[in-house]
Amino acid sequence: MKLTRSSAIVPDTDVTVAGWVHELRDLGGISFLLLRDRDGVMQITMPKKKVPPELVEHVRSLSRESVVRVAGLVKEELKAPQGFEIIPYEVELLNAAESPLPLDVTGKVRADLDTRLDARFMDVRLPATRAIFLIRATVLREVRAFLSARDFIEIQTPKMVATATEGGTQLFPISYFDREAFLNQSPQLYKQMMMAAGLERVFEVGPIFRAEEHDTRKHLNEITSIDVEASFLDDHEVMELLEELIQHVYVTVAERCSAPLQSLGVTLSIPHIPFKRIAYAEAIEIADIPWGDDLDTAAEKAVGEEIAEHYFIVDWPAELKPFYVQPRNNLCYAFDLMHPRMELASGARRIHDCALLVEQLAGKSLAPENFGFYLDAFRFGMPPHAGWGLGAERLLVTMLGLANIRESVLFPRDRRRITP
């Protein structure tokens, strides 16, 4: 079936298009079928004097959201949704939609988020919802292009593991034949091992799983993480890489996603780099919390309102960061990238000395013998390295001003939702 997408239609040509019945309108002497494809809504115009009455009756019988194919002549019509109309000479019903519909995809009757997620296949037909995922695809494509252009190699790491990557109990256990395993909470250990392998610069875009019982607008249990690790770079250099990536993504989305952004009513403000750096000590002073406390939602909000732009928090207490972060007295070479609304990424200069790593594992109450496969990589020539992990969903939420992180995922997994 050779079809023309609505965005590629040229006036005064014969075309064949296909899509969903968006709306039907009958004004007596003229009828309209609004047909929707991925690119937008097309106006199919049926004047009684130009279109056979049996074809008009056939179109009038169509149910909303039925799938149809239309062949006809394109005419310029500036009042039509995309500046043209199609005078049909053939309308074929490909599949009829049942009634009533689970959602109103015209946007005239709004549904709550849970109802939309329950009927997600319908919800994505809404222009504003579809726009989120067109932009998401652009963001992830540009992340890959940006890192590949800087000599990073894309890798894929295991999502089923035998032990915790970063310690703690935030793991989903699974049955792995005759023994217990877990869904991986981070590719951290594996991307570090690739530094010992000599790949030098790697990245991964893939799912991670956190068994956290949060039920908030900014937490999910399955997340798309953008992870980077680089040999012979320090924390400052990978921070620069991260802020350059963020700016690049904003610029590219603004340039290439004008229609989806318009559907969302969003005008992007491009962040300026370098981002501001503040020490943990300054952050807790702004938030009025004691030394040694992590920043909770209220603290993040207080600091975000003060800074009012993207910023890094640096000079963290070593006790608040994972075992693989390079310590510096009672501090460490770690950083968090923050948006005024929430944390976006965390990273650090890593430990590359095996003896220190074993010491840090024990200090975090983790058994070094459970990390033998990982520690081996540090015994035979591990270079200095640094890296970070960036949440794709949080990047989208803050970029587009979405109210809930679930809006940025086709089928979110949270504390309550495991279907569809």
Describe these PLM feature segments.
Residues L233-L245:
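Extended, domain-scale alpha-helical bundle/helix-rich regions
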Residues A181, H214-D215, L233, P271-P274, ...:
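Alpha-helix capping and helix-loop boundary segments enriched in small/acidic/polar residues
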Residues K2-S231, V397:
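Class II aminoacyl-tRNA synthetase-like tRNA-binding/catalytic domains
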Residues P102-V105, R136, Q156-M160, E204-P207, ...:
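Short coil/turn segments at secondary-structure boundaries
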Residues L147, M194, I284-A287, L361:
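Hydrophobic alpha-helix position signal
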Residues A197, R201-E204, T216, T224-D234, ...:
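TRNA-recognition modules of translation machinery and tRNA-sensing kinases, especially anticodon-binding
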